[in-house]
């Protein structure tokens, strides 16, 4: 008899969880409180339903080849970065192709998820739901929580002196959908993440003036890398290796040099404050808006008056009509009881960011409570692949006593300042994917691949680390993975080839010969080094802190 699994939420992580359950012959039932799937990707003109959804102008920050389900590539005619409508179309195609919609109960709210009295033996859960006023109770062998990390807006008004005196409109970015209501107004956007940058840019087209306040500053990345390819496509295993062995000071220096060569961040009021951790956003239009005066950069807010804002640098902006806080979200699991509710909000103590450490049976998985320097969709899919195999007993995790001891020790060390709280840090995409797929048995062996299939191995190691790599071997192997990898550049270029242009001949340079003849020798040398456990121990001991590998191409000096 198939084990029954409750999946809470039908967004990107909920859809992948349903599919992963079916792949492992589990019986999923998905509960979705709205009338449609897609979660925040299902656009709505208003925020009356209290749901966090995309705003109208949103465009994806991760290109299509790096942000698809691992056995379901985007169609080749899809743009590399797409509107929310296009992305939702992809989710619909995925759900229909694998027959996922029949497992979703729409307009159903999960009220409570509690352990059954015999949980220590069975690992089962009581799940109480409500559909249009009617309550239901059911028993499940496992639960996958796929509600994401954008449920409850974080609006720390108490941190802003004088905010109670301000007479203008105050809202959180969760309430923002379309700019029409803000025409001709003077607007302050507080917070410079991806959302803050996007909203400031969109409002600058119709507002009288937009002010963008940031405490720390940020590095601003473009969606295209040198040469015009999607910047995510430089996220390779080769660069991942380099970032592990190069000195951090060199990486920091070259990174700052490269970023400021593209855009002098200090001149634009964007540079990172001294002592602050580097932060990145993706925004192609923000520098232009600043250059044209449509967006004015400001320091952090010091005080509010009835209609003005005073900033830390002593400047004042008067006649402010609207303040939009883009201050993030708080994690929330209202259907759990304590202490499980609190434990699940602490990402750093979840085992591999998935399993709570205090359960005798590993039958509860938190899917999607992660921050990555890559696609969250891909990360949630591999979390779900691993979790469903744990449910079936095909993969194991350490006993709860050991996990709780490690979690307690970690929290104590953080409180004492011995180690840093990294719960808000973005995980390295390739490292985390490798870690999860190593547990599954789906991580490709690069040396073995070079022996069996050199052409494929070359693309896997030096090309973009696309999700298809984790379908080449092991459980969940997909016959189309090899072809998907070898044709990923074709799908990248296809939507750009809308005008036939005659090719101009390119002279063969010395660099081409060096690449052709020197690269194989270099690769063999690196693989030998890579396999040296002593070398890896030395590297890991000496170089504890690294930037995300896919940034490295931006750090490296280039000849003009």
Swiss-Prot record:
Membrane topology term: Single-pass membrane protein
Q: Which residues cross the membrane?
A: 510-530
An example of a Gene Ontology cellular component annotation for this protein is: endoplasmic reticulum membrane
Which residues does the annotation say bind NADP(+)?
A: 60-61, 195-198
Required co-factor(s) are: FAD
Q: Where in the cell is it found?
A: Microsome membrane; Endoplasmic reticulum membrane
**Pfam families hit by this protein:** FMO-like
Q: What Enzyme Commission number(s) apply to this enzyme?
A: 1.14.13.8
BP-aspect Gene Ontology terms = energy homeostasis; negative regulation of fatty acid oxidation; xenobiotic catabolic process
UniProt binding sites for FAD: 9-13, 32, 40-41
Which chemical reaction does it catalyze?
Answer: N,N-dimethylaniline + NADPH + O2 + H(+) = N,N-dimethylaniline N-oxide + NADP(+) + H2O
| GO terms assigned for molecular function | flavin adenine dinucleotide binding; N,N-dimethylaniline monooxygenase activity; NADP binding
Role noted for this protein: This protein is involved in the oxidative metabolism of a variety of xenobiotics such as drugs and pesticides.
Query: Can you say what this protein is called?
Result: Dimethylaniline monooxygenase [N-oxide-forming] 4
Q: Which organism was this protein described from? A: Mus musculus (Mouse)
Taxonomic lineage: Eukaryota, Metazoa, Chordata, Craniata, Vertebrata
Q: Gene encoding this polypeptide?
A: Fmo4
């Amino acid at each position: 008899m198939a084990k029954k699994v409750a999946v809470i939420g039908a967004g990107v992580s909920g859809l992948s969880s349903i599919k992963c359950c079916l792949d492992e012959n589990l019986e999923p039932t998905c509960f979705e409180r709205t009338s449609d799937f897609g979660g925040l990707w299902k656009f709505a003109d208003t925020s009356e339903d209290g749901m966090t959804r995309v705003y109208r102008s949103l465009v994806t920050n991760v290109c299509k080849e790096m942000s698809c389900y691992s056995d379901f590539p985007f169609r080749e005619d899809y743009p590399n970065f797409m509107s929310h409508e296009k992305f939702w179309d992809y989710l619909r195609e995925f759900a229909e192709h694998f027959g996922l919609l029949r497992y979703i109960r729409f307009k159903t709210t999960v009220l409570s998820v509690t352990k059954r009295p015999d949980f220590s033996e069975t690992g089962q859960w009581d799940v109480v739901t409500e559909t249009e006023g009617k309550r239901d109770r059911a028993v499940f062998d496992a639960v996958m929580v796929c509600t994401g990390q954008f449920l409850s807006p974080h609006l720390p008004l108490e941190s802003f002196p004088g905010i109670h005196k301000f007479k203008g409109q105050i809202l959180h970015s969760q309430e923002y959908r379309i700019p029409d209501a803000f025409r001709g107004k003077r607007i302050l956007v507080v917070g410079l993440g991806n959302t803050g940058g996007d909203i400031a840019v969109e409002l600058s087209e119709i507002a009288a003036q937009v002010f963008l306040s940031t405490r720390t500053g940020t590095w601003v990345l473009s969606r295209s890398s040198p040469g015009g390819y999607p910047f995510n496509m430089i996220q390779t295993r080769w660069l991942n290796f380099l970032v592990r062995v190069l000195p951090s000071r060199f990486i920091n220096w070259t990174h700052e040099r490269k970023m400021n060569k593209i855009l002098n961040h200090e001149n634009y009021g964007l540079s990172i404050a001294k002592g602050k951790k580097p932060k990145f956003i993706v925004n192609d239009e923000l520098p232009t808006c600043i250059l044209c005066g449509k967006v004015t950069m400001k320091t952090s807010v010091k005080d509010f008056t009835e209609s003005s804002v005073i900033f830390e640098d002593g400047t004042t902006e008067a006649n402010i009509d609207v303040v939009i806080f883009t201050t993030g979200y708080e994690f929330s699991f209202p259907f759990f009881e304590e202490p499980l509710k609190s434990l699940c909000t602490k990402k750093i103590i979840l085992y591999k960011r998935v399993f709570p450490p205090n359960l005798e049976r590993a039958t509860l998985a938190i899917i999607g409570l992660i921050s990555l320097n890559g696609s969250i969709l891909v990360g949630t899919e591999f979390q779900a692949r691993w979790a469903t195999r744990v449910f079936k007993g095909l993969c194991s995790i350490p006993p709860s006593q050991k996990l709780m001891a490690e979690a307690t020790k970690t929290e104590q060390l953080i409180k004492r300042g011995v180690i840093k709280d990294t719960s808000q840090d973005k995980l390295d995409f390739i490292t985390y994917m490798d870690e999860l797929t190593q547990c599954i048995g789906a991580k490709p062996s690069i040396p073995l691949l070079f022996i069996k299939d050199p052409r494929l191995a070359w693309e896997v190691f030096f090309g973009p680390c696309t999700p298809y790599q984790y379908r080449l071997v092991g459980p969940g192997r997909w016959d189309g993975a090899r072809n998907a990898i070898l044709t990923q550049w074709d799908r990248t270029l296809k939507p750009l080839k809308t005008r036939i242009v005659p090719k101009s001949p390119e002279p063969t340079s010395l660099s081409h010969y060096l690449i052709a003849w020197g690269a194989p020798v270099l690769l063999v040398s690196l693989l030998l080094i890579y396999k040296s456990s002593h070398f890896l121990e030395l590297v890991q001991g000496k170089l504890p802190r690294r930037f995300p590998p896919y940034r490295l191409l931006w750090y490296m000096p280039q000849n003009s």
